[in-house]
Amino acid sequence: MVFNLENEKDKKVLALSNFLIDNNILDHNELNSLIERIESIYFNKYIEEKVFLFAITISRPLTIDIWNALYEGFNELNEGFKADNESFKLTITFKENEPFFKSKNSFSSVTIAIIKDYFHSFFSKDKKYKILIEQELSNPNFLSYENDELKAQCQTKELTEWLVQKSKSFIFWMNNAGFKNFNFIALYPIDKNESKLKVKAVTVSQYDKQFETKVFATEFIPIHKINQQIDDVKIIGQIFELKTHESLTGKKTLNIYVTDFQLGGSLILKWSYTDEKKIEGITIGNWIKAHIQVERDPNTQILYGIVREINPVEIPNNYKRLDLSKQKRVELVFHTKMTAFDGINDIEEYAQFAKERGWKAITVTDKDNIHIYPKFYEVAKKYDLKAIYGLEFNLTDDHIKIVHNPDNTKLSDATFVIFDIETTGLHGRYDDVIEFSARKIKNNSEIDHQQFFLKIDKPIPKTITEITKITDEMLEGGIDQQQGLEKIRNYLDDCVMVAHNGINFDLPFLQTQFEKYNIKPLTNPLIDTLCLSWALNPLFSSHTLSNICSKLKLEFDDERLHRAEYDTEALKKVFFYFKKQLKEMGINTLTEIDQNLNKKCQIDLMKRVFTNTAIVYVKNQRGFQNLYEMLSIALTDHNANRPLVLASSLAKFRKSFLLTENPVQGDIFKAALTKPINELEKAIEKVDFVLISQPNAYLGYTLREGLKKELINDAIKLVIKTATKLKKLVAVASDAYFIHPWENEYYKAIVCAKGLGGKWHRHFNNKEKEQTVPEVFLHTTDEMLKRMSFLGEDIAYKLVVENTNKIVKLLDLNELVPTKNKLYPPVMQDSNQKLIDKTWKQAEKRYGKNLPKLIKERIEKELNAIISNGFGIVFWISHLLVEQSVKDGYFVGPRGSIGSSLIANLIGISEINPLAAHYLCEQCHYFEVSDSVDDGYDLMIRDCPKCHEKASFKGDGHNIPFATFMGFSGDKIPDIDLNFSSEYQAKAHDYVRKLFGVNNTFRAGTIATVAEKTAYGYARNYFEIIKRVDLATTAEIERFKQKLIGIKRTTGQHPGGIMIFPSDHSVYEFTPCGFPADDVESEWKTTHFEYDALGDAILKLDILGQDDPTMLKHLADLTKINPQNIPHFDKNLISMFSSNKPLNLKPGIVDEVTGAVGIPEFGTKFVRKILEQTKPKDFADLIRVSGLSHGKNVWADNAQKLIKSNRLTLRDVIACRDDIMLYLINKGMQAKDAFEIMEKVRKGIKVNAKEVSLMQNCGVEQYWINACLKINYLFPKAHAAAYVLMAWRIAWFKLYHPLSYYACLLSFKLKEHDINGFEKGYEFIKNRLDELNKLYRIKKIKPKEAELLTSYEVYLEMMARNIKLQQISIQNSNARMFVEHNGVLIAPFITIPGMGEAVASSIVEARNEKPFASLNDFKKRTKITKKHVETMEQLQLFDEFEHQDDHKLFN
């Protein structure tokens, strides 16, 4: 055989051939015979590869080294085959006439030596037993062979049991090596009471039957087919999750979650490794092939794999989904995961899929929203794709028909014909009428009645017989279709028709049948009682005939339902009732029904109306603003349980769009099934082009409505024929809701999940617990051409490829940008000048008229950056807000980096002074910078060295660079977050609206998506619904969960974000708007785009609500002390953060060593542990602790280790982002370089080699550089300082005004209370605290228990400080505040379990009017319930009343 040495595969075959010859396994003749016999034997569907057969016969003993070399050789050869997407299977046979292969009685000494090698090779792989095995093998009597039994005489029971456990795998391994028909026995010395451990090997014949002799078979078993323990198997799959576990000994196990994307096809592979290099290539998203052993977890009974070998591999061909067409199609309908409860994929996945297949453009058509547009723009740009911006929406006429063809006929004069038809299905074009029933009414009396059956030429569908009880036998005496339909037409003519759902079903069905039999259509009026009921009975949840009768108390027999004869009888009663209602409303004619009810009941009608699913595409840049306005109107003015676009609204903006319909749910395809040709033509005339989909996209019609697949094809052809006749372009779209066909299962999981408001998905039948999901994945060009081949090759190509590309050319895609990228600040007259004047005025007021150079230069630098970049308005608005809040008596706590600005400090936005530590005299303004401390609050109060005023020389300044707030060049948009009291937040929001107007102020919109726990629930629910809980393994649930996370559920609003739009621009230039969660009762509208998408263009104010400013306000009210007058320097207060000694606690009550319990930002267990370990010495250290506790990878495995191991202090480690910039500048680095390194590190971006070198050249210690490399996020120092200042003030009240402090802490910070428990005393509280701490440590504590844990800690501290807490007092308790009474704190009414604030307030309001005279009086004048009373009686709260006859309030 001639080998091509340029071919890698041939080279490997040659190398293996030489190996076989060199080791006397085969001779030349045998080898040639082998190679000539290589042939393609079958095609493996799972991995889509050709599989070649190798067969060799071995006729001599092979030592273990040759055996292993043979194994490795064939694995190498396999790699060569894999490179060509091929595989091979090796079959080895052994000559059985040699003693080595088939023992009679015993083996030779040479054979025994080889067996020992095999034994050692197999069993010594386990490190735990390797030494024991080697020791045993040194004993010549350890292994013996006689009578077809290989015996291992062990010295320990443990080893014996382990050998027994592994025996099956060993025997199989030895069978494949040629040792046949022998048993393996493991023995050890036993007592009389013990029995010998013995495992009989499965005989070779059984093994041959199960495994044949495929030692090196490289076929892969699909993961979803693994359903039992297997000793040796190979799989291929994609990694979707990695989790590393490290033991106490440092051994690392990587849990690799892999899947083959089939239902139940996920498995966790456990791989123990020591070398980090081994896991290269083992990353999420990569495909791997693995050689594993499948075991079953004894606890969960779930299968998992133990990795023997694992390697990255190319994606198998059947998962590649290549698009090989020279010209690609363009997808025109795709829904991302922003289509609520209906889309699966993120836009990035979609773009990547398109790019990999050579597509040039992609489309998004999410339903009822365009949240994805900003990200779509960025992603399309990233992948160099043209973005087609679409929107799918519910389209309806402005006027909702109640009467078809209304005229001025008076209801009192009309002759009505109430009718109903029974049919073989829902589709007038393909189904038939089988029963007709009608009753003629005149002057409220029935004057005639008709009922008859119509013959059909095929059996009645089984489902129709089940519903209507009409059988084939009943039709035998019926009229033929032509005669019957003519009779129906004549009977209905010249009367006012009345039918339930007549406009949408009965009349179109009949008109289509009339067309089919050349019968003249009906033109007379029809009253639809379904639509009429929508208007007259808006509160009915259902408007079926049976439910209407039930609600109106009209006699109705459910058993006789769905027969035309009985339905008309019931409908007559309903119509008479409705007629009476219409008369009472003053409605007397058919026209008045239609017009008056549309005016009065438009929203109620909109909630129920059957809509058309339309799609528009933005044609040009102007189209965005028009689309945003049209969508906003739908989301606000016409939001009737769903956003509706009215026809008039669409017409107003029509020129900016291309209009079509959803190919499956639109009116065009429905008309092809159910309406006459003229109605189909009307539908097609309305659109710019027609979309159809591939037949399997319409499977919902088959599964739900019984429409046969061949009729779907016929309807598609009818649409094409009619559109072509009308000269409308027709194109094919996937109508996709996910990308890959195997993602269908994820989609089904969402279909089975109950949506918001308890609504079920359109593809889910909750009654039957069945899904009717069509094939709606994203098709490649090749796939779509194949699906549409029933049209013929030329037509299919035209519709799939040519026409989709023609449509793209109708759009101007080159300049489309959905959002603006420059700032459009709101305008407020003279705001810049007011800011400048206020700044200098305040600077002079504080520092004197002759400002120090340091301060003057800082102000000038900041003002220049703020004003020149158009940010003055931001500062001025913030100033007005804070000023108003302070006027109203509420302090404001800033957060974020605003404290980096001196101007913010001067005009009152921030209390954080960013200057370096300095002294300032309150009297003479003498200013002096101090380098003796890191923070100005650590400067002791002194007498002024200049004017000698006592205690007037005070420290300030936290040394924070301005660059950390607005960037090195001062051009970063300032993000000013203000923490208002939660009691004042709403007033602050309203104040902004008052300043700028309702039409210019919006809440920042958010998108609520499926969270992790919800996704887990959806996944579990799906497996339960399909009754395959056995497949719901940990790995499989994880796979589903990951895909379901992030799917849109609804919209929301930022807790404090207010977007201010410029008054000289329309909001629609920037974004659509709507209501949070579509709540039309909401006081605020929200932006449709999230803040991040608008941040470069629109000013956002973060007006947040927090309890800390509320608490501070009430502390000030209780103590009459202004928090701003609390001293900056206080050694006792500093000490309290790391020690409880300043609190003077009674010994033996509190275990906590710090005094930080209940202090905001410092009271959590995590931060208290940091305080305990670091022991902060000053205010600067407290800021560092705050930074460490809020950063990511800053404390744990970083600063914590440095402080513990290197004996460093808080001052030596990186705690806040500003530390980096200040430290590097101090080391001599240029400010810009220091800033850029700081920006990288704070965002978790690794500094590069050049920047590391720059730090090293400046003398930066290596531990400091290493710390930078670990950090993922760094907290701003200004933010930390603001938190610490708030904590400092509250801590001061805790230390010096404990009763007021605990009253406010219990009122505003502790969410759960156990007043009864407090009264039970120390032992009870301590025991409960210990129980909850145990749950906390093992991470099994519930949220409510976690809140109680904090409360119990506070209770113990109160006991240790001798502060008493008393149960609720009807005469003295407040509604929601703990109040001081005679030196004791009294609990409020709201702490009564189950009592809300409204009920609690009603008690106080009634008591304030006059004291309660009795229990009965208490009951009458408050909002308490029976349950409340029972609880209050259990708490003995009524004991302060005298026992009267009315003691029992509810008898």
From Swiss-Prot:
Molecular function GO terms recorded = 3'-5' exonuclease activity; DNA binding; DNA-directed DNA polymerase activity
Subcellular localization is given as: Cytoplasm
Any one cellular component term from GO for this entry?
Answer: cytoplasm
Supply the InterPro entries for this chain: DNA_pol3_alpha_NTPase_dom, DNA_pol3_finger, DnaE2/DnaE/PolC, DNAPol_HHH, DnaQ, Exonuclease_RNaseT/DNA_pol3, NA-bd_OB-fold, PHP_dom
> Which Pfam family, giving just one, matches this sequence?
RNase_T
Sequence ranges assigned to domain Exonuclease in this UniProt record: 416-575
User: Major location, coarse class?
Assistant: cytoplasm
Signal as a keyword?
no
Q: Which UniProt keywords apply?
A: Cytoplasm, DNA replication, DNA-directed DNA polymerase, Exonuclease, Hydrolase, Nuclease, Nucleotidyltransferase, Transferase
User: Which GO BP terms apply?
Assistant: DNA-templated DNA replication
The chemistry this enzyme catalyses reads: DNA(n) + a 2'-deoxyribonucleoside 5'-triphosphate = DNA(n+1) + diphosphate
Q: Which SMART domains does the entry link to? A: EXOIII (SM00479), POLIIIAc (SM00481)
Q: What's its EC?
A: 2.7.7.7
Q: Does the keyword Cytoplasm apply?
A: yes
Task of the protein: Required for replicative DNA synthesis. This DNA polymerase also exhibits 3' to 5' exonuclease activity.
Its family remark reads:
Belongs to the DNA polymerase type-C family. PolC subfamily.
The identity of this protein, by name, is DNA polymerase III PolC-type
Q: Which organism is it from?
A: Mycoplasma genitalium (strain ATCC 33530 / DSM 19775 / NCTC 10195 / G37)
